[in-house]
UniProtKB/Swiss-Prot annotation:
Active site annotation, chain numbering: 25 (schiff-base intermediate with substrate), 58 (proton donor)
Post-translational modification: Is synthesized initially as an inactive proenzyme, which is activated by self-cleavage at a specific serine bond to produce a beta-subunit with a hydroxyl group at its C-terminus and an alpha-subunit with a pyruvoyl group at its N-terminus.
Record's GO cellular component terms: cytosol
Gene3D superfamilies linked to this entry: 2.40.40.20
Record function comment: Catalyzes the pyruvoyl-dependent decarboxylation of aspartate to produce beta-alanine.
PTM-bearing positions, type Pyruvic acid (Ser): 25
Family annotation (HAMAP family): PanD (MF_00446)
Gene behind the chain: panD
Protein name: Aspartate 1-decarboxylase
Pathway: Cofactor biosynthesis; (R)-pantothenate biosynthesis; beta-alanine from L-aspartate: step 1/1
Upper taxonomic lineage: Bacteria, Bacillati, Bacillota, Bacilli, Bacillales
This enzyme's EC code(s): 4.1.1.11
Residues that hold substrate according to the record: 57, 73-75
Length: 127
């Protein structure tokens, strides 16, 4: 049996752009992607902390160090520039792999630079 587990998480990302006329996806600073082991074209879930919206799309890598978090196409309807979002990727693991899997989690500052790398996410973690 395979289990779907969180593989990477970008916490407290601030939306820098929303481009309705782009074909689709989310553009993410590639330095952030590397830190959480996310790849171009990988499916991600985005949760908007400001309005509660949850959407799925795929990744386009942005300029490293730019701090870009840009929702494109229809996804742009679910955010406004300045909204704080959580971006998560998932992987499928065997039951044995799932027991030892450790997702990569980063917390960003208000300019979308990595502020902290969390070794684990415990119950009732608040920042």
């Amino acid at each position: 049996m395979f289990r779907t587990m969180m593989n990477g998480k970008i916490h407290r990302a601030t939306v820098t752009e929303a481009n309705l006329n782009y074909v689709g996806s989310i553009t993410i600073d590639s330095a952030i992607l590397e830190a959480v082991d996310m790849l171009p074209n990988e499916k991600v879930q985005i949760v908007n902390n400001n309005n509660g919206a949850r959407i799925e799309t795929y990744i386009i890598p942005g300029e490293p160090g730019s701090g870009v978090i840009c929702l494109n196409g229809a996804a742009a309807r679910h955010v406004q520039v300045g909204d704080v979002v959580i971006i998560m990727s998932y992987g499928m693991f065997t039951s044995e792999e799932a027991k030892t899997h450790e997702p990569k989690i980063v917390v960003l500052d208000e300019k979308n630079h990595i502020e902290m790398i969390l070794p684990e996410e415990k119950a009732h973690t608040t920042l």
